[in-house]
Amino acid sequence: MEDQAKIEETRQSAKGGGLTRRHLLAGAAGLAAVRIIPPRPAAHAAPATPLAIDGGPPVRATLLEAKLSGPQYYDDEEKNELIDVLENRSPFRWWGNNAKGHPPDKCINFEKEFAAHQQTKYCVAVTSGTTALMSALAGLGVGPGDEVILPAWTWYACYDAILAHGALPVFAEVDESMNIDPADLERNITPATKVIMTVHILGAPADMDPILEIARKRKLKVLEDCAQSVGVSYKGHPVGSMGDAGIYSFQVNKTISPGEGGAVVTSDPLVFEGATRYHDCGFLRDGHAKVLGQPARMKVFASPQFRMSEFTAAVLRAQLRKLDRIVADFRDKTTRVTEGIQDLPGIQFRKKNDTGGGLGNWVFINTSGKEQRDRFIKALRAENITAEPMGGSAILPIATHIEKKETLQPGWPSFTVGRGKTIEYGAKACPKTIDIWNRYVGIPMDPKFTDQDVADIIAAVRKVYPVVMKS
């Protein structure tokens, strides 16, 4: 069994593969109209030429790499929004010089617009996806002695946010969708469990129906982490709108981005008030009190400060207007690739909990195990097609500092109260998740891939797959 020193390479780069957090979003092709795909050889035909890894000519002369999605769509809309903030001389969200005769309005309007887009009542704009998680957990009342169940495969921020509140992270396995396994989730519930943190990982929704049913049955709160899935839906519902709260990241690797930022959404006024106070030094400002629309139910309390700036919100307002187009472009490319290779004998893709709701920024192909996966990746890279293991996150229970339960200070309440005193992490906490990570090959997609780029991906997979899968 590899230890996390090997697995942790997914945080920055798989050996020789340039895996970076710019691939944080995940693959799930959306349904699209049937398209004409490039000519291809018969499904069972051997490749016409040797693989590039074996000395043959590559499919492409240069490496095909997926670029950051949101910044590719920057134009005069973002520019004009930023100029408006500059000319108004009011970059802080609550007050300013108001040189154009109006108070700052980018943050408050983004919150209204994003809440409407996500079909929720409230939104709090914050500085990052991590601070969104921390604010949402505060709104849900999580603290020492509470347990929060989360998937073993996710980003470190999920674990970190739980620890920040002195609560105990409890890991559940993921399934072939790479999202939390509802059955294993239920097995991990104890009387101390307070919140289920379901992470819509790598651009694809978790299976929310059984998760919500478990939560209702066991009287638990559900926090949807949509950091890697802005623009994703589940059975017609935007992710983040089905649980008690949802969070999003607008970091540069995400669907839309001003460089960094985050948001919390909810339709529960108490969760909104708690998250709002937590992100703003315990205060409920007049602007948010007006949005709340009812008397405050909480007192001022000591907390951090994670307010978004007007500059960040300005870019996000312009990006939000383009979100549906970006998602449609992602899905178009991924659907065409999938259609072009789906007839290959025995090919298996990532399981989908919603065939049309994913972001569509990865194509994942299953293999027999790590050795075959690694050869598949090397072969595709030799053809100048970027390919990676499951990226953008980590198998948290085997991260060295998590397995050792390292904290900022000794005596951290997460591990001195209740089950936290005896809980053990490590590989035995997630064998199924490790197996899944060892099997999947990921091809990152770009919403602005050209027709030739799409054709090259199809050609490379069709060239490599029959050879590698026999090995």
Regions from the PLM with identified roles:
Residues E8-A32:
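N-terminal secretory signal peptides and thylakoid transit peptides that target proteins
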Residues I36-R93, A116:
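C-terminal segment of N-terminal export signals and the immediately downstream linker at the start
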Residues A52, A138-C226, S233:
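PLP-dependent aminotransferase-like
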Residues G96, D105-E147, A161, F171, ...:
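Phosphate-binding glycine-rich loop
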Residues S229-K235, V239-W362:
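Active-site region of PLP-dependent enzymes
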Residues F283-G293, R336-I341, I377-Y440:
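Conserved PLP cofactor-binding pocket of PLP-dependent enzymes
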Residues K351-D354, L359-K370, M390-L408, N438-D451:
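Conserved PLP-binding active-site segment of the aspartate aminotransferase-like
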